[in-house]
Amino acid sequence: MDAIRKASGQLHSYLPSLEFNQEHHRRINEEIGQQLSVDEVLQHPEFPHVNWPLQPDRKERIDVAAGRGGPFKISYELHGHGPRKIIWIMGLGGYMKTWQRQTKDFGHTESDQYSSLVFDNRGIGESDKPLLRYTTFEMAKDVVELLDHVGWIESRSVHVVGISMGGMIAQELVSSSRESSLSHLNFISTAPRIVRTLPYMENVRNRIDLMWPKALGAQISKVKADCYSAEWLKKPDETESIVQPFPTNGDRFASGELTKRLLPGAFTRQGFLCQLYAAGFHHKSAAQLKQLADAVGRERIMVLHGTGDHMIDFVHGKMLLAELGGEEGGVTKSFHDGMGHVAPFEIRHEFKRIIAGRIAETEKMAS
C-alpha cells in the first residue's frame, strides 16, 4: 500500500494546482437531462443482458512478464478465424468486454474475414493486478508476449487498434521491437504525452477522485461527462437489445459500467491507480514519434480523435498527427467534430467502416 500511496502522491504532484472545476460536468448533466438512477439501471429488464454471450474461439489466462516483476496472468479471448488479424488494446480502467461491439462486428458477424484478439491489461478485469510500477512500455511487452503466444508473428500481419492508454501502449510496440509484424497502427483518442490543457488535467484529477468512496451514481455521472458527448448520451439507446432497449445511450453506458464495477475483483483501486500511473507518465517526444513513423511507415498510421474529447483533449490528437509527420507525410487523419473520447461507442458503424477500410488499404501495400 505504501507504493500505491507514493504513486498517488506523485500523480497529484504532476497535476497543476487548480481549484477543481465542476462546470463541465454540470453543463453536460444539464444538457442530457434526467437519466436512469443506479437502482433503475439495475432493475431494467435489459441489465442482465448488457454483456453479450459472445463465445470466443479461444480463451486463456497466460503467464507474462517473467523477469519483469512477474510472472502474472493476462486474460485474453480470440474471436473469429479470418485471415485479417486485429488486436484491440483498451484504455485506462476499461476491460475486454468494453470492445464487445467491435468483437461482434469483426469477430462474429464477419468471423470468416477477421480474427479479433481482445484482452485485459494488467490491473483490470480477469487479468492479475500486481502491485508494482506500471509503464506503457512494460504493458507493451505484455502485448508482445501475448502476440507471440497466439502465433501472430508474421511480417506485416497484425492490425493494431489502441484507444486512450491503449494508444499509448500501441506507440510502445515499436520500441518493443515488434514493428516488423505490424500491418498498421490506429491511434484512437490518445496522446504522445500529456500537456497541461485544463480540461484534461481537471478530468484526470476527477478520475483519481472517483476512487475515493462516494455514491456510485455520482461516479457514473462523472465518467459520462468525461468520456462522452452530451449529444450521444441523450439519444435513444442505439445498441441492439435482447429484451428491451434502455431509454438512452447514457443509460446503456451506465449499465455496462455498473457490471464492471460490481463484479468482484474486476475493478480495484490498486489496479486503477497502477494503470493511471502508466498513462499519466507516458511520454513520446517528437523525435521518438518520427522514429516510430519511420519504422512502421506513415502510410500505415491513422490518428483518430474527437474535437469534443474531455478526457484527452483534442490538442493531443493534433500534436500526435503533426509529430508523426502529418497528412502531408502520409499519416491518415480522422478527426470528428463534437465527438467525445470513445469513438467505438459514439460512431460504432462509421468506426467499423474506418477500421475495415484501413485494413483493406494497408493489405494492398508492399511489405
Briefly describe each language-model feature range.
Residues 38-132:
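Conserved HGGG/HGGXW glycine-rich cap/lid loop of the alpha/beta-hydrolase fold
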Residues 115-161, 176:
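Active-site loop/oxyanion-hole signature of alpha/beta-hydrolase fold enzymes
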Residues 162-166, 170:
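Gly/Ala-rich beta-loop-alpha elbow adjacent to hydrolase catalytic centers
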Residues 175, 181-218:
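Flexible "cap/lid" loop of the alpha/beta hydrolase fold
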Residues 221-293, 297-300:
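Alpha/beta-hydrolase
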Residues 303-305, 309:
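Short beta-strand/loop motif that positions the catalytic acidic residue
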Residues 310-316:
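Conserved alpha/beta-hydrolase "acid-adjacent" motif
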Residues 318, 324-367:
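Catalytic active-site module of serine/aspartate enzymes centered on a nucleophile-bearing elbow/loop
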